[in-house]
């Protein structure tokens, strides 16, 4: 499907009663969790969430309310939502840090329980939003080695994994550095390296670009995309930054006040202004420029990345040149 084609009607709106687990949506007839690149997949999801609810003891309302979603091997998925939408709470269920009030989380078809939580954590690694919650050892090398050591690996294997992980994130030579002397972006890379060294099949990143300057943010996004493409790691990222999503995600889930509002490709999500308003989100900056051009009467299709924006601008210029030549 062309990126310039409006896709609003293809979005799966998860707040419709017809689209509860096991049913289909009224507009598309598709399973709501098999949109985008996962459509037509018959393999077992690497992560599956069924009717997940969670409530914190000090709150009356559910922090998560009947969440249903599936993540398939090799995907790059974004969970998009404003602050307080429930993204961090959702992610802490994915390897057993939090337990559901009701519903269940399955990893490779197995429900997370007290008995298998260690296995699940070997499959699903989590990078927390604040690296200071995760990077605690006196040196970078010790911090990255912590996970592999606790997996019972040999000293030689641990050393090899630490070396490979630091090379992957671009921090080779930082082994003896103290984490508290590093920048925020470097600490984030150390946290990612610590998870990489454990070689999980899935890495979950909670707001990985939060608090980073533009260059550090771009470096982290480039790294995690490389991890997906070169290592085949399934990636699940949460963010409130709408400008990040088009450059990372193949599929997007929109979370609002603990409820899954919609799922679809980035193009589909950002072609639904009503959904964005409801979820307290906005268009990516690139798309806002095209929206303003349309309001000025320019015949353009809204784009969401710099690359597709360039192509669309060139198309419009060539079209206008042809019209001028015909006069």
From Swiss-Prot:
Q: Which residues form the signal peptide?
A: none
Query: Could you give a GO molecular-function term held by this entry?
Result: ATP binding
Could you tell me the membrane topology recorded for this protein? Peripheral membrane protein
Q: Name one GO biological process term.
A: cobalt ion transport
Give residues annotated as binding ATP. 81-88
List localization entries: Cell membrane
Q: Which GO terms describe its cellular component?
A: ATP-binding cassette (ABC) transporter complex
| One Pfam family this sequence matches | ABC_tran
Q: Which PROSITE patterns match?
A: ABC_TRANSPORTER_1, ABC_TRANSPORTER_2
Annotated SMART domains: AAA
Span list, region Disordered: 1-44
Q: Where is the ABC transporter domain?
A: 47-282
Keywords, A to Z, come to: ATP-binding, Cell membrane, Membrane, Nucleotide-binding, Translocase, Transport
Give the UniProt family note.
Belongs to the ABC transporter superfamily.
What is known about what this protein does?
Probably part of an ABC transporter complex. Responsible for energy coupling to the transport system.
Q: What's the protein name?
A: Putative ABC transporter ATP-binding protein MM_0887
């Amino acid at each position: 499907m062309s990126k310039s084609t409006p896709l609003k009607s293809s979005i799966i709106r998860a707040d419709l009663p017809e689209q509860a687990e096991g049913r289909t949506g009224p507009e598309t007839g598709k399973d709501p969790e098999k949109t985008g690149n996962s459509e037509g997949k018959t393999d077992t999801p690497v992560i599956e969430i069924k009717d997940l609810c969670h409530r914190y003891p000090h709150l009356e309302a559910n922090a998560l309310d009947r969440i249903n979603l599936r993540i398939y091997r090799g995907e790059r998925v974004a969970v998009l939502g404003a602050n307080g939408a429930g993204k961090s709470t959702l992610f802490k269920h994915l390897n057993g840090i939090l337990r559901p009030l009701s519903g269940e989380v399955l990893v490779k078809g197995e429900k997370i329980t007290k008995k298998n939580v260690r296995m699940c954590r070997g499959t699903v690694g989590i990078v927390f939003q604040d690296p200071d919650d995760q990077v605690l050892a006196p040196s970078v090398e010790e911090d990255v080695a912590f996970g592999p050591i606790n997996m019972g690996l040999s000293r030689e294997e641990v050393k090899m994994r630490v070396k490979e992980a630091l090379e992957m994130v671009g921090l080779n030579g930082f082994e003896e550095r103290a984490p508290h002397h590093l920048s925020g972006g470097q600490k984030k890379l150390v946290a990612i390296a610590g998870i990489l060294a454990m070689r999980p099949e899935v890495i979950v990143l909670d707001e990985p670009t939060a608090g980073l300057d533009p260059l550090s943010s771009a470096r982290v996004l480039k790294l995690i995309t490389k991890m997906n493409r070169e290592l085949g790691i399934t990636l699940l990222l949460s963010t409130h930054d709408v400008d990040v999503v088009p450059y990372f995600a193949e599929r997007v889930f929109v979370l609002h006040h603990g409820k899954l509002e919609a799922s679809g490709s980035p193009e589909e999500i950002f072609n639904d202004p009503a959904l964005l308003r409801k979820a307290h989100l906005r268009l990516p900056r690139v798309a806002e420029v095209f929206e303003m051009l349309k309001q000025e009467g320019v015949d353009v299709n809204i784009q969401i990345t710099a690359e597709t924006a360039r192509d669309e601008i060139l198309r419009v210029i060539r079209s206008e040149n042809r019209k001028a030549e015909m006069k």
